[in-house]
Amino acid sequence: MIVIVDYGLGNISNVKRAIEHLGYEVVVSNKQNIIDQAETIILPGVGHFKDAMSEIKRLNLDAILAKNTDKKMIGICLGMQLMYEHSDEGDASGLGFIPGNISRIQTEYPVPHLGWNNLVSKHPMLNQDVYFVHSYQAPMSENVIAYAQYGTDIPAIVQFNNYIGIQFHPEKSGTYGLQILRQAIQGGFIND
């Protein structure tokens, strides 16, 4: 079972619809007894990092997610950023599952990074356009599987142990985005 974590700031209905379209059983919840049953946990998100972490803590989801670190967790957009240690957006601590700091995009191009952009990767399936909406980015590191070029290199997919972060919106990136979401659910992008 896949559980989409509901903390009140997310693109939940679109993500749920996309996962159902792929044929998976999916439940939306913020309850420990449901999250504990998940094989895969999806952390969606749209909005401000500090506000999201405040809600996650208010709902005790930080502790619940910390008890489920043996499971695959996929963060989408803000959800990816929340898995990091810290963000400059609101100077807030994250969940700390992936090492690094989230920082504002530094580019001569307009911010937010909004619209379609091509993925760059050594992975054979990660080479098409996907849909981005964000103003902050993860650091470039050995955990980056694919990135986009937007006046600077912006991590688009990261994988660290059983944590997968997807900065763009796979649920808004057409058939190709669904293929990426399926690959993330099935095991990720390392050692393919």
Curated annotation (Swiss-Prot):
The active site is at residues 77, 169, 171. It comes from the Bacteria. This is Imidazole glycerol phosphate synthase subunit HisH. Residues 1-192 form the Glutamine amidotransferase type-1 domain. Transmembrane segments: none annotated. It comes from Staphylococcus aureus (strain bovine RF122 / ET3-1). GO terms for molecular function: glutaminase activity; imidazoleglycerol-phosphate synthase activity; lyase activity. The keyword Repeat does not apply. It catalyses: 5-[(5-phospho-1-deoxy-D-ribulos-1-ylimino)methylamino]-1-(5-phospho-beta-D-ribosyl)imidazole-4-carboxamide + L-glutamine = D-erythro-1-(imidazol-4-yl)glycerol 3-phosphate + 5-amino-1-(5-phospho-beta-D-ribosyl)imidazole-4-carboxamide + L-glutamate + H(+); L-glutamine + H2O = L-glutamate + NH4(+). InterPro entries: Class_I_gatase-like, GATASE, Imidazole-glycPsynth_HisH. IGPS catalyzes the conversion of PRFAR and glutamine to IGP, AICAR and glutamate. The HisH subunit catalyzes the hydrolysis of glutamine to glutamate and ammonia as part of the synthesis of IGP and AICAR. The resulting ammonia molecule is channeled to the active site of HisF. Pathway: Amino-acid biosynthesis; L-histidine biosynthesis; L-histidine from 5-phospho-alpha-D-ribose 1-diphosphate: step 5/9. CDD domains: GATase1_IGP_Synthase (cd01748). One of its GO terms (cellular component) is cytoplasm. The keyword Amino-acid biosynthesis applies. Keywords: Amino-acid biosynthesis, Cytoplasm, Glutamine amidotransferase, Histidine biosynthesis, Hydrolase, Lyase.
